[in-house]
Amino acid sequence: MPESGGNMANYAIMRCKKLTGMGSVASALQHCYRERETPNANAERTPENYCSVSKSTDQAMGRVRELLPEKRRKDAVLAVEYVMTASPEWWKEATPRQQAEFFARSEQWLEKKYGKDRVVAAVVHRDEATPHLSAFVVPLTQDGRLSAKEFIGGRSKMREDQSTYAESVKKLGLERGIEGSRATHQTVQHYYESINRGTRSQVSISPEALEPRVLRKGIFTKD
């Protein structure tokens, strides 16, 4: 099990972004599947990426259309994009088997939360500095309502998600961030940039950066 040197802990990291509009969903998926220019990715390593659900944007969008109810609000959240990773230091020590288990457990957490058929895309990115899982889910309730609020609305729900997610990967030597800490808002783009800076600059991720809230066009963060 990977362990950090000294008193430095390794953390489970989860962020999400709400997507409204089919164009926004398709654009995010194209980035995920490397079907558009991705400056932060190393093209030579892109073949190391792999997906476990849909194989392309077209397939994923087809699954989205199948799930979406015909009647929905114009401003409804159609999908939620997740980025799931761990402290950069953890990846340096984790074995290939441990890394594979991290991705499997992360996807299983999403399936348990939303339902397996609601996870329309799950792609492991190894062509960036810090490996991570990018996943897309349709926030459809069991009774057929489209409701992101029911799944990720409210701070108590978000804290619960952070705790249960960290618990799901705890056996891999990862911890949850400190509850009640404060962090600034980041856009998903900035978060991807911070992921990629992590390994190159060997920046440690503090627990204070892991306590979230949800913004419509951002990621889990806190005021």
Residue ranges and their predicted role:
Residues M1-D223:
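N-terminal nicking endonuclease/strand-transfer module with a His-rich metal-binding environment
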